[in-house]
Amino acid sequence: MQNSRTLRRLAADHAQLHNDLPTNYLFPPNPQHDDDLSQLDVLLAGPTHTPFAAGVWKLHLAIPDNYPQQPPTANFRTKIFHPNVNEKGQICVETLKRDWDSKLTLRDVLVTISCLLIQPNPDSALNAEAGALIQQDYDAFAQRVELMTSIHASIP
């Protein structure tokens, strides 16, 4: 059960998102968790000039009861081939782990995740195959990303 401080903070973070959603993000047409501030579904369009550019991914944030002291968890609900995302869609980024700061907002979290599509971090790979491929042969990695994007996340 979330306390009043957490609910106020969540309301402020959601208001910020509705007023200033980061670039490349959209709210889905029929959000599943529209009345639950502890759950957030957004769509992330791949950044231009990246192998992800032709795709749109559904992203889910689950906000814990003790937010902002504890970070939200983030999962891709659409399959993505990325060094920092495992098969279950879980995202590995230090901002949501060791580097979390209670001053960070949900908007900051979304910006951090979109930056991972621009600059993957193979040194903290959850997907070992993608991490090795990006380090050994970026062109082959980009081709694989484009193929997986066309299969799972293509823009209709």
Feature map (PLM): residue ranges:
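UBC/E2-like fold recognition across ubiquitin and ubiquitin-like conjugation systems
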Residues: 1-156
